[in-house]
Amino acid sequence: MDISRAEQRILHILAQGGCIQVEKDEDGRIAEISCVTRDGWHLPGLDLALFRKVKRKGAIASTNGGPYRITRRGLQLVRSQTDNR
């Protein structure tokens, strides 16, 4: 299964230890989404549509109401990239 460049970018950040933090409104609907790297930087470019696409593919999951992290399925989908650290 191919994934888009934007999905690839998000999954790569999550594979390195980042997370997706979700804030919900009073009705329980998602109000705000932010992707945070392992260093604490907020990554732009994550919108609700992209979040739903990645979640639908089973690449991310939340446990016990915590932030969304990459799953084993997500690790299989993500292609390795060189990291300039």
Curated annotation (Swiss-Prot):
Belongs to the UPF0386 family. This is UPF0386 protein Meso_1721. It comes from Chelativorans sp. (strain BNC1). NCBIfam families: PRK13687.1. Signal peptide: none annotated.
